[in-house]
Swiss-Prot record:
It comes from Arabidopsis thaliana (Mouse-ear cress). It holds the Pfam family F-box. Keywords: Leucine-rich repeat, Repeat. It comes from the Eukaryota. Residues 4-50 form the F-box domain. LRR repeats lie at residues 265-288, 292-315, 318-343. This is F-box/LRR-repeat protein At2g42730. Gene3D superfamilies: 1.20.1280.50.
Length: 457
């Protein structure tokens, strides 16, 4: 008995699971093997249909690929009638203008909803008029995970209800029916645990996210939005990127463990604020910062750190903060860093993605941009930081002076981890490492670890 016969004699349920481990296209192709395999692929409950496997070279190719793609989906879903579909991933990236029949997309979605689908991922790059998401998608009693993008229109009916939905991702969709469509949708998801909203289309948009079950939240705005309020008492992970909003009226994230803020504003306006030609930034971040004050792990991009300086004159006490990482950008300053370190009495780990930053006399005593009065007690001297990590270390004189400042001022340091970028000059790299090892240290327990990375890494 050969290996093929052994596999063919396995129970249908086992064969269905095996076929679920390969791509849907490959699973369908097994139907030509023998009569035994002719309709075996209908046992596959996880369908993954993606046109990226075919790379179009010309417009004609794109049109043909798109037609074949739609015909394949039609045929596949037609053969699945009566079968269980647990997961459908439907992706098309060809983006032929006028080539996608929105009614067919809607029929595909309705088809799998009728099959009791639990995990639905529809990501189709559309050109032209945005088709609406079928209303029944927001009334599903079986959906546990839902991702919709890109270019669809969402309009909610009064009877929206997703009782089992735990993960929701909305990527570049159009919202119709008021400013707080997202908030309304979330309120109809009683067990929602993870929410991702990436919005690049709407302008003058406001949102209020209130959910006692939400644990993870990622929001990204690439346009100028108005405001967002957040009330998620059990949220443990929060990521906020894109444009900073004008207002954060209410932010309550009392259980937060980790936060990542990567916010920016128009560069022209930022330059004006920095040089004094503009009075202030059109954003009030005070409620946002107060709302995350219980966080334990905080990641701030260099843009965010500078925005905080121009938006917040005061900083709350971060009693629970144990790890802080700062982004790297030579065009952004560290003006807010002294106050942030001072107001983090239990900070143990301080991470810099790089030491390059905008030279200013407002960085206080945390850096060596300008000579500081030695009689002034540094915020570093009272810090409890035990681990200092520096990434992308280039070994410049300015960086070496900054490292000297850190080592002389941080009294509780136990470990310094430095990632040196190798410039292909082994002798220079060796000298950089030697210079680092010879620096004086305020802490007798301080050890320095140096890791050398080549630029290819």
């Amino acid at each position: 008995m050969n290996a093929k016969d052994v596999i063919s004699r396995l129970p249908d349920e086992v064969l269905g699971r095996i076929l679920s481990l390969i791509s849907t296209k490959e699973a369908v192709s097994t139907s030509v093997l023998s009569k035994r395999w002719k309709n075996m692929f209908v046992l596959v409950s996880n369908l993954d249909i993606d046109d990226r496997q075919s790379v179009p070279k010309t417009k004609q190719n794109r049109i043909e690929i798109h037609r074949n793609y739609m015909a394949f989906v039609d045929k596949l879903l037609d053969t699945q009638r009566g079968s269980s579909i647990k997961k459908l991933t439907l992706k098309s990236h060809v983006g032929v203008r006028g080539g996608t029949d929105s009614s067919r997309i809607q029929s595909w979605i309705c088809n799998v909803l009728d099959h009791g689908v639990m995990d639905l991922d529809v990501f189709i790059t559309l050109k032209g008029k945005s088709p609406p998401v079928p209303a029944m998608i927001f009334k599903s009693k079986t959906l546990v995970k839902l991702r919709v993008g890109r270019g669809f229109t969402i309009k909610l009916s009064q009877d929206v209800s997703l009782p089992l939905l735990r993960t929701l991702c909305l990527d570049s969709v159009n919202f119709v029916g008021g400013h707080n469509v997202v908030g309304t949708l979330i309120s109809r998801c009683p067990v929602l645990e993870e929410l991702v909203v990436e919005e690049r289309r709407c302008v003058d948009w406001t949102c209020s996210v209130s959910s006692p079950s939400l644990k993870r939240l990622h929001i990204r705005f690439d346009r100028k939005f108005t405001s967002i309020s957040l009330d998620a008492p059990n949220l443990i992970y929060y990521k906020h990127s894109g444009y900073v909003l004008g207002k954060y009226p209410n932010v309550k994230l009392d259980s937060l463990i980790e936060a990542r803020l990567n916010l920016r504003m128009d560069e022209t306006r930022m330059v004006g604020v920095r040089n004094g030609s503009l009075g202030s930034i059109p954003a009030d971040m005070r409620n946002l910062i107060n709302g995350i004050r219980n966080v334990r792990i905080l990641h701030l991009s260099s843009h965010t750190l500078e925005l905080l300086y121009f938006s917040c004159k005061e900083m709350p006490l971060f009693d629970s903060l144990v790890s802080l990482s700062i982004g790297n950008d030579k065009a952004r300053g560290w003006q807010m860093l002294p106050l942030l370190i001072k107001n983090s009495p239990n900070l143990e780990t301080l991470i810099f993605m790089g030491l390059d930053h905008y030279i200013t006399n407002r960085c206080g005593d945390v850096c060596v941009c300008y000579d500081t009065d030695e009689s002034i007690t540094s915020c570093l001297s009272s810090s409890q930081v035990k681990v200092l990590e520096i990434l992308s270390y280039q070994g410049t004189t300015r960086e070496l002076n900054q490292m000297k400042h850190f080592l002389e001022k941080l009294p509780c340091l136990e470990l310094v981890k430095i990632c040196v970028v190798n410039n292909s000059n082994n002798l220079q790299t060796t000298m950089e490492m030697r210079n680092l090892m010879m620096l004086p240290r305020a802490s007798s327990k301080c050890k320095i670890q140096v890791k050398v990375l080549t630029k290819n890494n």
